[in-house]
Amino acid sequence: VAAGRAGRRRRHRAAGPWPAGGGEGRRGQPGGQPGSGVPGQKEPGHRHISHLYGLYPGHQISVEETPELAQAARRTLEYRLENGGGHTGWSRAWIANFWARLHDAQKLQENLELLLTKSTLPNLFDNHPPFQIDGNFGGTAAIAQALLQSSAGRIELLPALPEKWREGCIRRLRAKGNLHVDLSWENGRLTCVRLSAPSGYRGVLSCGGVSRELILRPGESIRLDGRLQERLE
C-alpha cells in the first residue's frame, strides 16, 4: 500500500507542470500538450495530434454536440498543416479522418489525394518512410468515415461525401451496435440503404438533415430510400 501511494505521488509530481486538458492554445486550438498552441512549442507542424483523440477515433468532440471544441479542433488542424504537418503517411491518414469527423468533405478529399500521391509507394504500401501500415488502414478508415459515422445509438450516412464521389455504392460497412450497412448514392445524394441487425438495434438514423428512429429485432433487416422511408425488400 505504501509503495502504491509513493508511486501515485511521483506520478502527480510528474504530471504537475503539464497544462490542464480542455483549455485552448493561443490560436484557439485545444490545449493540453506541447505543440497544441501553448507557449514554448517547438514543433508546430508535429506529426502527432494526440490531443484530438476525442475527435477521432473518440466521440467526445463532435460538430453537433460540442461545436466550440469542434471549431478549436479545426483550428488545430489548420495550424498544423500551415506549419508542415501531415508529412508522414500515417499522420496524413489521421488528418483525413479528423476532417471527416468535422464534416469537411473538401479537406477530406484533399488529404486523401495527398496520402495517395505523396505518401504511397507504387505497390500501394504507405510510405512513412519506411513502410508503415497505419497509413493504409487509416486511409481506408477515412473513406469509411466519409460514408458512415456511428456512435452509441446514432448513425449518420454520407456525412462527409466529397463532391468528386458523385455516385457509388458500398456493402457491409459495420456501424456501432453490430449493424451491417449497404448503401448507394447518385449525384451526391443517398438513393438506397439496407440495414441488417444480427443482434438487434435501437437508435437514430440520419442523412442530409433527415432523421428517423430505427428499431430492429435480432436478425431483422430494413431497406430505406433516400429520404429514409421504408421500401419493400
Residue ranges, per PLM feature:
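Active-site core of glycosidic bond-cleaving carbohydrate-active enzymes
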Residues: 1-154, 191
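Non-catalytic C-terminal accessory modules of carbohydrate-active enzymes
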Residues: 106-232
